[in-house]
């Protein structure tokens, strides 16, 4: 025991002496080491835990297209004053377009002295900020006759922060209506109300409410969150996933870029099965690329090599996935005279986004091929060869699991 104590005491004394010792470090500046790339530091975005809808994407209406459930209407409810009635039900006929799978039909019996309301609670509340102006838009048709108002209220509905009378003469054809509301108070848990004082039916779809956005981009991002991303000065933005790229159960649940561009009413959205909720794809391919541009960062696009969690396309049949990748690159990089470059210009961005970095697959080549992908190296080569043949300056990356590195 005494010997152990002596050793311990000696160690403590040695440590104390060492802490007071002078240490010299010689640096040979004439012999630098490996040059470190300035592009190593970047950010990665994946729609997990509502990182897009309800997060960075500025849309305030939750379940805006009524697609989140086949039977119920999550985040929406109705209310009626005494003497009024309102009924809401999902319908799947006479829809706005082929991208929309459902709409909401309201049957209303109200009057100015007894109104009826459709209410949306937003994503855990709508943030009403005094002096802030919100842009409302929605599509509607029906037989309704009477007045309509849009409001922001507190959660109980007994305090109005913003209100506007809508010039909405509802007719038989789908029509887009727009309005603005300016809040006169602050409430992080506010709600949106559409208030009716007449009678008839209204069929609604794509009800949208936007606050001001980062750099005033249409269909843009929350300025507070996007500014924080800007402040860290990332050199690249990796998107859109992650497992989000691949989806689960079927290839329809994967991220398909061409379904995420254009007007929001033309985006069908998809089931984000990996993370257990539906996404509107309002934050789509253009929005990711625009984010990278606004952050002065390079986009790093992750493409699917032909798989989804629970299934895959055989390696000898992946040409459609390669075509999808090549079309995405043409949309991002092609001239306006090209098919997809012209579509990019039509959607508001004639100048190329210039994707230089491409990640081919996500966490592929798992030890158990059934879990992810067989023949990953062959898949990688097929993609890389196709990309470099048309875009020789594009840098292709792989993302493997540890046992293969």
Language model segments and positions:
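Solvent-exposed loop/turn segments at secondary-structure junctions
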Residues: 49-50, 243-246, 305-309, 362-367, ...
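Active-site groove signature of glycoside hydrolases
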Residues: 241, 338-371
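Structured alpha-helical segments in the cores of large, soluble enzyme domains
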Residues: 284-294, 339-348, 383
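Surface-exposed amphipathic alpha-helices with a cationic face
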Residues: 289, 293, 329, 333, ...
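Short, well-structured secondary-structure segments
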Residues: 298-302, 359
């Amino acid at each position: 025991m005494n010997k152990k104590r002596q050793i311990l005491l000696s160690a403590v004394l040695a440590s104390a002496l060492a802490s007071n010792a002078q240490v010299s470090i010689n640096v040979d500046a004439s012999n630098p080491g490996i040059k470190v790339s300035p592009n190593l530091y970047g950010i990665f975005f994946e729609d997990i835990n509502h990182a897009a809808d309800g997060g960075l994407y500025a849309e305030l209406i939750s379940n805006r297209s009524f697609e989140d459930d086949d039977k119920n209407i999550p985040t929406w409810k109705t209310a009626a004053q005494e003497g009024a009635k309102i009924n809401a039900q999902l319908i799947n006929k006479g829809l706005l377009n082929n991208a929309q799978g459902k709409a909401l039909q309201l049957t209303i019996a109200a009057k100015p002295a007894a109104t009826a309301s459709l209410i949306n609670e937003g994503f855990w509340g709508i943030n009403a900020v005094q002096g802030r102006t919100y842009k409302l838009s929605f599509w509607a048709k029906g037989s309704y006759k009477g007045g309509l108002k849009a409001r922001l209220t507190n959660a109980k509905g007994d305090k109005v922060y913003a209100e506007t009378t809508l010039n909405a003469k509802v007719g038989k054809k789908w029509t887009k209506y727009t309005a603005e509301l300016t809040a006169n108070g602050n409430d992080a848990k506010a709600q949106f109300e559409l208030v009716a004082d007449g009678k008839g039916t209204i069929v609604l779809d794509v009800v949208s409410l936007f606050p001001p956005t980062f750099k005033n981009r249409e269909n843009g991002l929350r300025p507070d969150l996007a500014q924080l991303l800007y402040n860290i000065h990332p050199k690249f933005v990796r998107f859109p996933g992650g497992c989000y790229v691949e989806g689960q159960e079927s290839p329809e649940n994967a991220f398909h870029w061409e379904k995420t561009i254009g007007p929001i009413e033309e985006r069908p959205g998809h089931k984000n099965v990996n993370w257990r909720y539906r996404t509107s794809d309002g934050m789509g391919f253009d929005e990711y690329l625009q984010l990278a541009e606004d952050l002065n960062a390079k986009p790093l696009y992750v493409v699917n090599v032909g798989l989804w969690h629970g299934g895959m396309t055989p390696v000898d049949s992946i040409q459609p996935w390669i075509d999808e990748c090549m079309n995405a690159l043409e949309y991002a990089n092609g001239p306006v005279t090209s098919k997809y470059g012209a579509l990019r210009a039509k959607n508001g961005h004639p100048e190329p986004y210039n994707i230089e970095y491409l990640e081919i697959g996500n966490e592929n080549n798992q030890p158990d091929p059934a879990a992810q992908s067989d023949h990953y190296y062959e898949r990688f080569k097929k993609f890389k060869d196709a990309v470099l043949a048309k875009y020789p300056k594009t840098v292709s990356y792989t993302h493997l699991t540890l046992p293969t590195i």
